[in-house]
Amino acid sequence: MRNICVIGSCSMDLVVTSDKRPKAGETVLGTSFQTVPGGKGANQAVAAARLGAQVFMVGKVGDDHYGTAILNNLKANGVRTDYMEPVTHTESGTAHIVLAEGDNSIVVVKGANDDITPAYALNALEQIEKVDMVLIQQEIPEETVDEVCKYCHSHDIPIILNPAPARPLKQETIDHATYLTPNEHEASILFPELTISEALALYPAKLFITEGKQGVRYSAGSKEVLIPSFPVEPVDTTGAGDTFNAAFAVALAEGKDIEAALRFANRAASLSVCSFGAQGGMPTRNEVEELLS
């Protein structure tokens, strides 16, 4: 069993389902409303745990009922919460999600996630006895992402930086990350002067650009490779990217080569969109391996 440390956001998702996505100034009727645990960090932690890794979640929640529910959900999914801390007088992070026409739109309120400082994250990393892979995203302070990538680089700990939500990154942070996994929109923010192919060629076997139902694209050095996704009828795409990143982390930590790891991650992500909720459809190890066989 590999040890994976996820440093990132934990939130409660407030999910509205509608037949139509509202335009600016428009009011539409929804068909359902649910609250489900989410946050990119928590989603990736749960997905990695279901795929068989021992997962340590490093993050913060508010001192509210959402925070309690988030912690209970992590524990119920086998995620270690030794390095999770409630923040007094602060609300838990929330994500406000509209599901319509098989896709989603999301507004994130950081809440306690904004209190994850570099010192807090690095202290947790130093205490975990052995880390095979670190996963980090951008729903936490920018300086924390920068310092964690720098620490991992200097200590030879592989780290996947999932640069979502999109924002520009310092060049040294890009250099310090072992792997970068933006989607097409995020890649355009990271590399505004480059085409997709130019960016991939600049970072072979480091930059992996996810393209939704098309799959994931990367440079193998001498050629550009597209690993196709597995075709499914999506119910809820909210957790697909998080499942992809978690599965990619697990596969790499287990020693799979890049192409095999990407195929594993694509299959896991495809399965994840077949049920409601960011975490609801996240598959087990057996489910992914059955699809691969």
From Swiss-Prot:
What span is annotated as the signal peptide, if there is one? none
EC class name? transferase
Concerning InterPro entries, the annotation shows: Carboh/pur_kinase_PfkB_CS, PfkB_dom, Ribo/fructo_kinase, Ribokinase, Ribokinase-like
Task: Provide the alphabetized UniProt keywords.
Answer: ATP-binding, Carbohydrate metabolism, Cytoplasm, Kinase, Magnesium, Metal-binding, Nucleotide-binding, Potassium, Transferase
CDD domains for this protein: ribokinase
| Catalytic center residues | D242
**Record text on activity regulation:** Activated by a monovalent cation that binds near, but not in, the active site. The most likely occupant of the site in vivo is potassium. Ion binding induces a conformational change that may alter substrate affinity.
Under what name is this protein listed?
Answer: Ribokinase
The record lists the organism as Bacillus subtilis (strain 168)
